[in-house]
């Protein structure tokens, strides 16, 4: 995303997003005010339909991960973004954050949602929002469950 796109996202602040899965809906609030580059990237991909018809390729007792167009954990959008962190956004149950390789600036499209607190990840991964509804859905996800679509929700 451009600096202008990130600046617009920062002005908007909190952005409601719905992740429609084969198990139900997950509602999250993205913190564009604190993580403008990361949120602008995620929203841009979502609005382009990048995440549509994807899968959760990784599910463990503490995390679910998706956003890879290949469904393997090795794919992405063809670019990476700079690591962005904020001390008030922690790796706690319900946090949504960007997955990446061992290089800090390697996130692209893959994201994770935590099913359990993982403070060990704080400061190393870009937490950019929080689930506000649908953690029961997150808890029921298994490998291969579909991400039908991700869209910015109506704020009303």
Language model features: what each stretch is:
Residues 1-156:
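Cyclophilin-like peptidyl-prolyl cis-trans isomerases
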